Amino acid sequence: MLFSRSILRGMPKAGIPKSPLALSASRNLRLANSVRFASDAASSPKSTTSKWKILKRTTLGLFATAVVLYGANVYRFRHPDPHQPLPDPSKKTLVVLGAGWGATSILRTIDTSLFNVIVVSPRNYFLFTSLLPSTATGSVHTRSIVQPIRYMLRHKSCYVKFYEAECTDVDADKKVIHIKKTTTDGVDLEQEIKYDYLVCSHGAETQTFNIPGIAEYGCFLKEIWDAQKIRARILHCLEQAQFKDLPAETRRRYVHTVVVGGGPTGMEFAGEMADFIEDDLKSWYPELADDFAVTLVEALPSVLPMFSAKLRDYTQSLFDSSHIKIRTNTALKKVTAENIHVEVKNPDGSKQEEVIPYGLLVWAGGNRARPLTKKLMEGSEEQNNRRGLVVDEYLKLKGYKDIFALGDCTHTAYAPTAQVASQQGAYLGQLFNKLGSLNFEKPSEDRHIALGDEMDSSTLISLANEKHASTKVFLPFKYSHQGSLAYVGHEKAIADIEVPWFGKQLHASGALAFYFWRSVYLSELYSLRNRTNVTLDWIRVKLFGRDISSL
């Protein structure tokens, strides 16, 4: 039996004939399988191709959308509304003094349909002061960081009157300000302007502490013409150092930059100057390459006191590697045409005098009150601080009716920075919007409060808060610190960033902080025009370097 099975197993099997229907089904099955295998083999490249098409179309769509939005913004910039409603005599008049951070923040926030708004400023533009150190060395053009004040005013809902003039006096009893403008012929034109509400945001002057010679021989860094003066002085010293064969000591003096002041402005300029020297001047003036020097002088024991100790140490080490000499505990006493005289405090407490030669002296000191601020101080006993105007929790000027103040002309618990002035301006803009709503709502249960012409802003605020005690229509100003930024050279920056949900500060330094610094400053620039120009300036410097023409 086993033998027969093995024989059968080895013999070929007889073929079993299949029906035509079975043969057709078999052929169809093989054809379907071959089609399926072919589609599987081709599915991978086709899928990849379709994904790339989707990505390409999405990218093109986003780019086209960005171009359209950019074009719309540019068109809006170039074509303000030619039919702004004119001032309404029935509305109250709000006068804003200045065109700085605080004033422009008010103008951004306020609803001009609620008031007849008048702006008075000696300059007809807003200056982005945070980038002034960059303009002094040519990293950014001066016109890239200014915005005409009329651009802001022409894009408001109602007409805003602007006077390019200086406010010389305030008559608080008559509610009148006196303004003066000097014509090109040297003639002084004067005018009076009546107000219902007045906002003093006229800023401050550079504090010199009565140091002899600082105003005559030093360069400040507060206005656009200061940056232009510094740049002209840099190039003048360079060419003068090469005019003829000079003693080595004299040549080194011409190319020695001294910066007095260890705050953010002084540190940023020192960093920008070091970049200018390393990236450009050493290439175009190779014979002076070994003579360039930058020294930073600070009277306090350390620089950048508003930053953390970790970031101060980082800046110190970076400046050391950049050959920027930081001299702390060194107070400026006198300035002459060629030297500065300083008093150095030694570790043992003793003091010694020292003379430092210089070619360019940049003074980055503090602020002092303008003449108008001093007059307002003298006009009320409640103005008892000589450093600036004293205000209450609503930024109302103490001792005066319907006068508010903000920014560098005031003395508060906050540092005199652009960040503080911007938040104060936004707060006052919202406060005036609420006051305007109280004054002009129809009908309103609050209207009987507002109709009293003799009621000043303090009375209105108090009555409104009493009537709505649960919600408090008017809240006191509260500053929210967002952090501190400073550029320290070599495409590096430092940043102390406040993170509310994190509960503490984040400290950043280096290249990452540098790009964060740039992104923040770009976002803070007033308009798309400013952002475009500054971005193009940065690209220009990266590609071609800084210009060294004496223009």
From Swiss-Prot:
<dbReference type="Pfam" id="PF07992">
    <property type="entry name" value="Pyr_redox_2"/>
</dbReference>
<dbReference type="GO" id="GO:0005739">
    <property type="term" value="C:mitochondrion"/>
</dbReference>
<keyword id="KW-0285">Flavoprotein</keyword>
<dbReference type="GO" id="GO:0016491">
    <property type="term" value="F:oxidoreductase activity"/>
</dbReference>
<keyword id="KW-0496">Mitochondrion</keyword>
<dbReference type="InterPro" id="IPR045024">
    <property type="entry name" value="NDH-2"/>
</dbReference>
<dbReference type="GO" id="GO:0006119">
    <property type="term" value="P:oxidative phosphorylation"/>
</dbReference>
<dbReference type="InterPro" id="IPR036188">
    <property type="entry name" value="FAD/NAD-bd_sf"/>
</dbReference>
<dbReference type="GO" id="GO:0050136">
    <property type="term" value="F:NADH:ubiquinone reductase (non-electrogenic) activity"/>
</dbReference>
<feature type="binding site">
    <location>
        <begin position="255"/>
        <end position="291"/>
    </location>
    <ligand>
        <name>NAD(+)</name>
    </ligand>
</feature>
<keyword id="KW-0520">NAD</keyword>
<comment type="function">
    <text>Catalyzes the oxidation of NADH.</text>
</comment>
<protein>
    <recommendedName>
        <fullName>Probable NADH-ubiquinone oxidoreductase C3A11.07, mitochondrial</fullName>
        <ecNumber>1.6.5.9</ecNumber>
    </recommendedName>
</protein>
<keyword id="KW-0809">Transit peptide</keyword>
<keyword id="KW-0830">Ubiquinone</keyword>
<dbReference type="GO" id="GO:0031966">
    <property type="term" value="C:mitochondrial membrane"/>
</dbReference>
<dbReference type="InterPro" id="IPR054585">
    <property type="entry name" value="NDH2-like_C"/>
</dbReference>
<dbReference type="InterPro" id="IPR023753">
    <property type="entry name" value="FAD/NAD-binding_dom"/>
</dbReference>
<feature type="binding site">
    <location>
        <begin position="93"/>
        <end position="123"/>
    </location>
    <ligand>
        <name>FAD</name>
    </ligand>
</feature>
<keyword id="KW-0274">FAD</keyword>
<dbReference type="Pfam" id="PF22366">
    <property type="entry name" value="NDH2_C"/>
</dbReference>
<feature type="transit peptide" description="Mitochondrion">
    <location>
        <begin position="1"/>
        <end position="37"/>
    </location>
</feature>
<keyword id="KW-0560">Oxidoreductase</keyword>
<comment type="similarity">
    <text>Belongs to the NADH dehydrogenase family.</text>
</comment>
